């Protein structure tokens, strides 16, 4: 993972997604949807990849910590639009999640103002009523794919979910499509299924 600075915007290149750019926050502390009512982590977030390996290095953490305050700037939306000027695909949150409705509204503005860019936003925040309106408006945009992440690691999901974890690829639930990264050493290798509404993964 490599960090890039456009004006004051800190964005990353995600190695799994063939270098597609991403804007991220620190994992868990911005992931309200990762916690059960009793305070334990939901199964899908236990052992989160974004809390291990390279994500623990200070130079990787720093941009995510800066992003948590940087998005509140008045010029953040216009700076993000400029940063995405030559991007055709963009991932929101390779770590972290939408922890604020105000942040979600700003992300929606960026999506509106960058129709040339296909946005992918995986999130667990749809379980909270206050986020459902802005997420629905995001979904209504032609250039946006919001994927609601299931909390399960055993393939359980309901109609709203667009992403679910399974421990055994042979136990793929009916109606779901297996992410090809399973067969490509953890890499997308040009596959863009995650940006379409073709299937769950």
Residue ranges of each PLM-predicted region?
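Helix-rich interaction surfaces within compact, conserved domain-sized segments
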Residues: 164-169
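Conserved small/polar residues in nucleotide/adenosyl-binding loops
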Residues: 194-200
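Extended repeat-based interaction scaffolds and adjacent low-complexity, acidic/S/T/P-biased segments
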Residues: 173-186
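Glycine-rich, charge-decorated loop segments at or immediately adjacent to ligand/cofactor-binding or catalytic sites
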Residues: 130-134
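Core AdoMet radical
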Residues: 51-77, 81-103, 111-129, 143-155
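N-terminal [4Fe-4S]-dependent radical SAM core
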Residues: 1-69, 86
């Amino acid at each position: 993972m490599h960090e890039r600075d456009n004006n004051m915007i800190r964005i990353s290149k995600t190695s799994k997604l063939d270098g597609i750019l991403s804007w991220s926050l620190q994992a868990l502390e911005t992931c309200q949807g990762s916690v059960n009512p009793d305070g334990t982590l939901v199964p899908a977030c236990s052992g989160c990849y974004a809390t291990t390996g390279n994500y623990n290095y200070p130079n990787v953490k720093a941009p995510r910590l800066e992003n948590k305050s940087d998005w509140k700037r008045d010029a953040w939306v216009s700076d993000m639009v400029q940063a995405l000027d030559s991007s055709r695909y963009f991932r929101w949150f390779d770590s972290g999640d939408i922890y604020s409705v105000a942040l979600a509204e700003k992300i929606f503005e960026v999506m509106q103002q960058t129709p040339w860019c296909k946005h992918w936003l995986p999130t667990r925040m749809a379980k909270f009523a206050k986020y459902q309106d802005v997420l629905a408006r995001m979904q209504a945009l032609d250039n946006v794919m919001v994927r609601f992440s299931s909390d399960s690691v055993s393939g359980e999901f309901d109609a709203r979910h667009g992403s679910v974890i399974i421990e055994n690829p042979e136990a793929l639930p009916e109606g779901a499509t297996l992410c090809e990264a399973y067969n490509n050493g953890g890499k997308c290798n040009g596959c863009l299924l995650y940006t379409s509404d073709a299937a769950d993964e």
